């Protein structure tokens, strides 16, 4: 398991280096290092309960995701970033709510259609699956990827996040690297040998690109978390409607 995590981190590190080479001017290696450190720790933390008997006998990594949330809050507390830097605010940028609602509906419809095409029989773990999917992944993963990692990546490439953030090549590269760091978790595995699944990469990657846009456009993690939660609810519901 840890071999797989380190391989994924190495691949993400290589992509990060490429992004730094492309930008060059005003890049900050310190934030680049923090990006890799934060990514690696978040990947390890979510798996720790399995090794210390803290999984509570449940079917999903509740405690692991809770530890991810704690990890982000601790990082913000002791690190160079402020809560507002990573989108921990309910305040939305002016005139951003309606476009954010439209995009939330769009990603929900997209994931619902993909669920209808790709999903088989409904999961028998009805209540736990529902409760987990609408809470822990949206909260933990958006805090880590769309909040902490996206901000560190933008800072590493020499830009900052504010209401007038332009979608220049720094922002595009930061979004791509951050979304890639999420998608690779599902696409690249190691079980006696490396295995790569493009299909397992595409949907998580697209989702993180959309959530990154929501984060940067609104200035808050509120809509990314809501969009993730609502779309997960639809993905959970679709198999029951079709069977």
Give the role of each language-model region:
Residues 35, 49-58, 83-89, 149-150, ...:
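A cytosolic-side transmembrane-helix exit/cap motif
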Residues 1-82, 112, 188-196, 233-243:
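N-terminal, membrane-interfacial amphipathic/helix-forming hydrophobic leader that caps
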């Amino acid at each position: 398991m840890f071999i797989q995590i380190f391989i994924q981190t190495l691949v993400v590190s290589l992509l990060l280096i490429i992004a730094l080479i492309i930008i060059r001017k005003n890049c900050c290696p310190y934030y680049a290092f923090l990006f890799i450190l934060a990514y690696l720790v978040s990947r390890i933390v979510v798996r720790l309960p399995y090794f210390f008997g803290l999984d509570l006998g449940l079917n999903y990594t509740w405690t692991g995701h809770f530890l991810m949330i704690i990890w982000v809050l601790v990082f913000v507390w002791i690190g160079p970033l402020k809560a507002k830097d990573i989108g921990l605010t309910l305040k939305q940028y002016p005139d951003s709510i309606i476009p954010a609602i439209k995009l939330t509906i769009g990603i929900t419809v997209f994931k619902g259609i993909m669920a209808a095409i790709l999903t088989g029989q409904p999961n028998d773990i009805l209540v736990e699956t529902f409760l987990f999917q609408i809470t822990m992944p949206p909260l933990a993963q958006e805090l880590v990827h769309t909040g902490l990692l996206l901000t560190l990546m933008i800072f590493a490439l020499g830009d900052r996040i504010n209401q007038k953030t332009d979608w220049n090549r720094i922002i595009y590269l930061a979004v791509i690297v951050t979304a890639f760091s999420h998608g690779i978790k599902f696409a690249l595995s190691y079980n006696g040998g490396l295995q790569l699944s493009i299909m397992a990469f595409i949907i998580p990657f697209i989702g993180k690109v959309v959530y990154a846009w929501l984060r940067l456009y609104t200035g808050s993690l509120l809509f990314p978390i809501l969009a993730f939660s609502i779309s997960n609810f639809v993905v959970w519901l679709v198999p029951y409607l079709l069977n």
